[in-house]
Amino acid sequence: FFHAEDGIRDQPRSRGLGDVYKRQVTHDSYEAFYLGSKCGIILNQELKQFDDPYKVYHFPNSVEVVNFLNRGILIPAKVTGENTLENWDLGTIEGNFMKPYPKGSNVQLLLQPEDLEHDDKSNLKLEVVDRKFRGTNFIYTLKTNSNLLIPVFVHSHHIHQHEVDEKFGIKRPINIDHIVCF
């Protein structure tokens, strides 16, 4: 669901709010992110999050919103410091936590396709299980040793493409600008 402020402001005053929302509602999050100045996620008749599209995407406030958006995965991790956590398959992940967690906390880390960077020279290699062309980029689905499936974007101008069953390097250290955990 999205809200375009200009669209609402420009509607004739004689129309009711329900009429405006009929024209301004979508179930496609890509469309909502593109068109909306504000996005609201309504699940089970309850408003779960309402904010600008950037914040809804990058800072979802619940696992329900993460699952609804379906733009990343939650992986198990352990908080090891003020700006670090560990995942069994990926190793150390650095960044800025959006909420504080005590050292030693077990959390679910949100990994979005743009969070990991490809690096052919890296010693962290994951198996390619799928590759989809998306115009400006490819989205690779990579399998970890513990069978997690992780989506990763790679610019479509990348020198070479990786095929299914090939190994795919992930740049280390892993640094995520904003670490979202639950």
Predicted regions and their residues:
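Internal alpha/beta loop-helix hairpins
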Residues: K22-G91
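Short, solvent-exposed secondary-structure boundary motifs
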Residues: F1-H3, E64-N70, D119, R131
